[in-house]
Each structure stands twice: as structure tokens, then as C-alpha cells.
Amino acid sequence: MLTVISPAKTLDYDTPPVTERFTLPQYLDESQALIQQLRELSPAQISELMHLSDKLAGLNAARFGSWTPDFTPANAKQALLAFKGDVYTGLDAESLSEDDFSYAQGHLRMLSGLYGLLRPLDLMQPYRLEMGTKLANARGKDLYAFWGTRISEWLNQALADQGDDVLLNLASNEYFSAVKRSALKARVINVDFKDQKNGQYKIISFYAKKARGMMSRFVIQQRISTPEQLKQFDAQGYYYSAEQSKPDHLVFLRDHPAE
């Protein structure tokens, strides 16, 4: 089983990585093509394109300018440790063991607007480029057109490498839309996390994002390999709802959100 998650806007390049092991992103030719195009944009154009403040636009213009195809631990950091945010708070990669990182490397992928698909130990230089960005390019009107069926093909290869065909989708709609289902040779398992509010179970974004990270951690640490085993997930009060679930759409409920 292969798990996919979204990246994060928040990055941490200050905290030293907890592992010295690293790999290099596999699709840097694609990334470099995007970088070359992004370098042609002024900070004002970046601000308008990405809906960023002038300060953030300037920061990311500088990031695009300093990006280099030569990745080292001095200018980059392992993706799973560089990303922060709600999903990554739940995943808590800093406390994973070396064996956990080894398992994650084969069974977890992060979708990315710039890198396409990242493995946990792939070095990543800092960037901001959300998948939904309407960056017109030689392949079409946006990043979905740029990546086309490539991400699906790479996921197919990763699944083939582990001899499986189950893809666990813990990514947002924005990012999973970059996976072209028609080109994907996999059974996709979707998951919803619902918290009780005013007597009803609802998807609450902050809690759901954190839960996606917690389930990713659960899969890594428990070496989960089948959808059936996912039903055992019970972190921070969540429990599997057989009533609300379908074979390829699992639903987990929580009565009292943990603070």
C-alpha cells in the first residue's frame, strides 16, 4: 500500500534533521523547467499569481532565484522533515526511527506543485508553488496540465516496485486532482475524519488535516499494508465507523476533539 499526502506551505529549514540519510528528487528536469519559467516573474507578478503579500512574494522570488539543480544537505532538507503544518504536526516525523524512515521511503509520497512527487528522504530546496496555481506553461493553462499523467505514472511505478495496487489517499482535493485517475493502475482508498459538533459529525479542516498526518504515522509505524488494517486506527479518540464507511471510502469519527 502506498500513501499520498499534500505538502505544506510552512517550511522548517532551521531545525537540524534527525537523520543524516537522504535521497535526491527523481524528477528534477521537470522542476527545473518550472523554475526557469518562475524566474521570469517579478515579485509583483508572483504576488498576483499566488495571492501572496509583497513580503512573501519577495521571499519566493528570491527562492526561485537561488534554486539550483545541485542538491546538498547544505542547501536542502529531507522533504518529510522540511514540511510543517497541520498534517505534519500529526505525522511528527522528528520522532520516527531510522527503520520507520526506511519503511516510509518505500510507502509514502508527498505531492508537490514544483517537484511533482517526493519521497520522504528526498532533499528539497525551499519553495512555494501550490498545485492549484494557474501558471500557464508550454503544456497548458495550469500545473495540472503541466504534470499531466506523469504523477499517475510515477505512482504506478512506486506501487509496482512494492508489488501492490492499493493507493491510500490522504491528500487534499487540490493535490489529489493532480493524480489522473484514468492513468492510475490502482485501487484508491479515500478517508474522511469527522468530529462531533453541535450533535452532528462534520469534517473540520484543522482536525482532519492533523488526522491525515496521524494516520500516515500509524501506517508507517505499524507497517500497515491492507485497507482492512486501517480500520484499527484509533489515535486521539478517532474510531472506525462501519455504518458510514464504504469499501473504498473509510470514515472515522470522534466524539470529543482532543485539544
Curated annotation (Swiss-Prot):
NCBIfam families, alphabetized: PRK02101.1-1, PRK02101.1-3
Pfam families attached to this UniProt entry: H2O2_YaaD
GO CC term (a single one): cytosol
Record's protein name: UPF0246 protein PP_1289
Organism: Pseudomonas putida (strain ATCC 47054 / DSM 6125 / CFBP 8728 / NCIMB 11950 / KT2440)
Family membership: Belongs to the UPF0246 family.
GO terms under biological process: response to hydroperoxide
Coiled-coil intervals: none
